[in-house]
Structure formats: C-alpha cells, structure tokens
A protein has these predicted regions:
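Conserved phosphotransfer microenvironments
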Residues: 21-27, 46, 58-90, 99-106
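Conserved C-terminal alpha-helix-loop-beta "cap" of PLP-dependent enzymes
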Residues: 456-551
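Non-catalytic signal-transmission and effector/linker regions of two-component phosphorelay proteins
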Residues: 1-32, 36
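Output/docking surface of receiver
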Residues: 15, 42-44, 74-75, 99-104, ...
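Conserved PLP-enzyme active-site core in the AAT-like
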Residues: 43-46, 69, 219, 239-249, ...
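Conserved N-terminal alpha-helix of the aminotransferase class I/II PLP-enzyme fold
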Residues: 190-238
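N-terminal "arm"/small-domain region of PLP-dependent enzymes with the aminotransferase-like
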Residues: 126-210
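Short hydrophobic/Thr-rich beta-strand motif most characteristic of the beta2 strand and flanking loop
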Residues: 31-45, 52
Length: 551
C-alpha cells in the first residue's frame, strides 16, 4: 500500500496564490510534492486551515506560514493558535513553520515546543524542502500502524500463495462461480487475502497470545488501563463466559445484577453457580435503573444469602464473584469505586459487564465510573471489565476485549487461558483481531479523548435540539389535539430556562448528569448522592402518550 497517496500534506499559507516571491516559492514547493504524487491540501486562511485539519485528521504533515494575517472573520486566529489546537488533537503529526531565519528569535517558546522545525522557502531549493516534508511524513506514517495490523498487511502484500486453511485460498475459490465472483468483488481482494489461519507463524497465535497478537494485546492493556487484556472474537457474550469459567466453580455463591445479559445467565448454568440477585430500580416509564447502593451493603447481602433456598449453610458459603452491568442499556453508569468499597470484604472478584461503555476511560466526564480505574491497594478485589469494542468503538462485529485489573483474587494466566480457549475458535477471524488492534491505536494518547468529546458534543446538540423543537411546536398556533412531539429522558438542567447549562459545562461536569435523590426527572427513589450517572451519549426518547406515572 502506498501510504503517501492516502495521507496528504496540509499547506496553510495566505500567500499561496499571491504574485510575490513568497507566494511563488510556496507554489513551487506544492508543485514538487504533487509531481511526486504526493497530495496537497491548500488553505489560504487560519480558519480554513483549521477546518481542513479537522475534516482531514489523517494528514501526514502540516506547513503553517508564521506570518499568517489574523482576520476578524476568522476570530483573529493566529499561526500560534493553530499549532496549539493541532498539537492538542494530534501530538505526533509533523508541524513545520514557514518563516525566515531572522524571524525565529521572535517565535515564543510555547510555539517552538509544539513544532518539528522550520522551512526557509526563500533560501533552500524547492526540491530539497519538498523532500524534507516527504521524509517527515514518511517517518510519521511508519508509526501509524499498530503491530498486528501491520503484520497482517505485510503478509497480504507479500503476494504469497495460500497452502493452508481457509478453503477459499485467499478468495480464489470464489472466482470459480458467478455468485462467488460477485461475493469476491463486493468484499474485495484484501479482505479475502487477509482471511488467514493459525498456520501463519508470522502473525502469532491468539490462543497462545504470542507474536504480534500478544504484542497487540499488551498494547491494549496499556491503553485501556488493565494489567492484562485478552482479545475476544466471539463478542462480549463469550468474554463474560470466559470470566466465569476461569473463576467460578460448581456451588459457588455469586452476586448477580438481575439486569444482566443473557450470557451471564448462561455462565451461571455452565459453572453451576448459585446466584443471589441484586434487584435494580425501575421507574414508571419501564426504564431499568441502577441497583440501589443499599442493595450492595454487606448486611443486606448476608440476609439475601440467608433467605436463598439453594444455600443450605450460609456461613460456609462465601461469595465468589459479583457481576454488575455498567453501564445499562439506557446509559446508567455507577461509581465503580463505591461498588468496590461496598463489596471489598465480601468478594474476591468483581465483573463489570461494560459492553456499552468501552470509551469511559478516555474522558474525564466518566472519571471513577469504569472498571479499569487505578487502584494501588492489593487487597482490593480483582476486577474484570468485558467491553464490546465493536458496539461503541471502531471494530468489526464480535470484536470485544476482556480486561483484568489484578487484586487479591488470584488470576493464573495458564488456567485463565484454558477458559479462554474453551470459547475461542482455533480458526479466529483475523480481520476482527486487526480491528481490535486498530481500535486500540485510535484510542491511544490524545486521540481517544477527542473522539469521545466529539460524540459528547453531538449527543448534547441532539438533546438540546429535541427540546427546542418541542418548544417551537408548543409556541405554534396548533390546537392541543394536533400537538405532539417526543421528549428526552434527561436532567432538567439540559434546557430548563432557569437551570440550563452551557454545552461546554455539560461536556465536562459530571454533576450535570447525576441521578440526584432530590430530582424527579429520573423517576427512581432511594438513589444515593453521586452514586449513579446518566451517560450523555445514550439518549432515551420518550414517546407521546406515556406519562411519568406510567399512564
């Protein structure tokens, strides 16, 4: 693959089209790059350059004219402002300032720390400057690909014959039939050539976590804050069962969120565990809310165990594991720290099913509301977080991750891996593994925060627009019987005239989204202060005709 054709250079210079020495020099540099089939995006103002960067985040190098003229229409955006915004979103893309040697002394240290160098377009030759830009872009792109995906691409692009499974032999078998030819054309040759088997030693083994697969899993653990991460190609359904098969034995007592996924119920059956259910709240809309914190207190759990008809001798049955859904389908996420505090003395293992919240670690709005939070106390329970990467991040369907945060509950990798192998095919789909590897790369560093921030921005705009439309309809001359519109299940401060918060506050202040005990919007009683929060990204629409009382 020729990366250079896919990753353009962004040239921000207000003299690009001017009949000046600087303008002619800039055009010659651009021409040199284009003559070498290197695409260039041209921007004549700071604002246009910023928009070009935001709409083309895959640019491989950025050239900024230090003498860009700030314009009122651009909000007086300067070259220094551009370097700060770009560097905040991408800490590695090369940035060069187009300037003169004598002007360097006037460039602030803050700007110097954000750039990779200077270009003196009136002194060096155009060919040399273009080559310098191209080299910087190539160096940047050499680090773009994560380990497994890089290895997979290298193998596919090495034009090797397939002497192993799968039987379609790199897609060739599909070419022997009309339906197969259409299938081949639809999915493309690279997809089919990348459908490989464990017979390719260069790519390591998912079952043994070796080679570039193991390297990719270790990188994922680092990015997602885990002590160890396993790539699961059977979705979070398989990941949930792996956790249970590795930690629970027949007759063990387990605490189970009654609002759990079917795979957790399957795990109970498969392991022969004895479930004690934690009942979540439910409001009059029928929305399932959080398990009240009172349900997770040791004395309440002890009473539940005493009343369980399957437990003959409660004193001889310690609780092995607790499984909590975080977040719920409607976006209720817990203070995981409080849950761990309540369960600390009762269980060795806590399993957070985070199928719908794999992005929470990457934005401060969700601080303390995900399983892979930092913990320095080895006496804390061991925590598992199973995440559907394919649901909420950029991965292929069935691509999930199983994260482990080691505590006092033993996790022997060899034993754990036996449970892993029971539920993972010996012929895993390599494109799923590659997508998990790429999802990790996308969330690493500053990128993860900004990807989540974009989702938050869009969700908040949507929430506010839904309310604004309702207000416009109410203000119209329609008769009451012709009036209807959807409402959004959300805190009043989103749009209430007296308490409305600004978009930036809503993106940064978790307090705006808490299920406070003195508020009626959520419809749950007995909720502890700061215990549960509504994820802004999960929008629940209430249809006309259903009242808050369920009528």
């Amino acid at each position: 693959m020729d990366y250079l054709e896919e990753f353009p250079v962004l040239f921000i210079d207000d003299e690009l089209h001017s009949d000046t020495a600087e303008g002619r020099a800039s055009r010659e540099i651009v021409k040199e790059l284009k003559d070498e089939d290197f695409p260039v995006i041209e921007a004549l103002t700071a604002r246009d350059g910023l928009h070009a960067f935001l709409s083309h985040p895959h640019v491989s190098c950025i050239i900024i004219d230090w003498d860009l003229t700030p314009e009122p229409a651009d909000g007086m955006l300067t070259a220094a402002d551009l370097t700060a915004i770009i560097r905040e979103r991408n800490p590695k893309v090369p940035i060069f300032l187009n300037t003169e040697k004598l002007a360097i002394s006037a460039i602030p240290l803050g700007v110097i720390s954000r750039i990779d160098g200077y270009i003196w377009k009136l002194e060096d030759t155009h060919a040399f400057i273009a080559g310098h830009i191209k080299r910087a872009a190539k160096n940047y792109l050499s680090d773009v690909l994560p380990p497994f995906f890089r290895g997979l691409m290298d193998y596919v692009e090495d034009y090797r014959y397939s002497w192993h499974t799968p039987g379609h032999m790199g897609g060739v078998a599909f070419l022997k039939n009309a339906a197969g030819r259409i299938f081949y054309n639809f999915f493309g040759e690279n997809t089919l050539r990348a459908d490989l088997s464990v017979s390719v030693p260069e790519l390591g083994s998912l079952l043994e976590h070796s080679g570039v697969v193991g390297e990719a899993e270790r990188k994922a653990a680092e990015v997602f804050g885990a002590d160890r991460t396993y790539f699961v190609t059977g979705g979070t359904s398989a990941a949930n069962r792996i956790v249970w098969l590795a930690t629970v034995t027949p007759g063990d007592l387990v605490l189970v969120d009654r609002n759990c996924h079917a795979s957790v119920m399957h795990a109970i059956i498969m392991t022969g565990a004895i479930p004690v259910y934690l009942m979540p709240a439910r409001n009059d809309y029928g929305i399932i809310g959080p398990i009240r914190s009172g349900e997770i207190r040791p004395e309440i759990i002890a009473e539940k165990i005493r009343r369980c008809p399957l437990v003959e001798d409660p004193a001889s049955h310690p609780v092995r594991l607790a499984a909590i859904t975080n977040s719920t389908y409607d976006g209720i996420c817990y203070s995981t720290e409080r849950i761990e505090e309540n369960l600390r003395e009762m269980v060795e293992y806590i399993h957070f099913d985070e199928a719908w919240s794999g992005y929470a670690r990457f934005h401060p709005l969700y601080a303390g509301r995900f399983g892979m939070r930092r913990s320095t106390d080895p006496a804390d329970p061991t925590v598992f977080a199973t995440q559907s990467t394919h649901k909420v991040l950029a991965a292929f369907s069935q691509g999930s991750m199983l994260h482990v945060r080691q505590g006092r509950g033993a996790v022997d990798h060899a034993r754990f891996n036996e449970a892993f192998m029971m539920l993972i095919s010996t012929s895993p789909q390599y494109t799923i593994i590659a997508s998990l590897d790429v999802a990790t790369k996308m969330m690493a560093g500053h990128s993860g925060k900004f990807l989540v921030e974009e989702a938050l921005e869009e969700a908040i705009v949507f929430r506010k627009k839904m309310v604004a439309v309702a207000e416009e309809i109410r203000a119209s001359p329609l008769s009451p019987e012709n009036y209807w519109w959807f409402t959004v299940w959300q805190p009043d401060c989103i749009m209430d005239q007296e308490t409305e918060k600004g978009d930036q506050v809503l993106q940064e202040d978790a307090g705006c989204w808490l299920l406070n005990p003195d508020e009626v919007w959520h419809g749950f009683d007995g909720i502890e202060e700061g215990y549960a929060m509504l994820d802004p990204v999960k929008v629940t629409i209430l249809t006309p005709g259903i009242g808050a009382d369920g009528g």
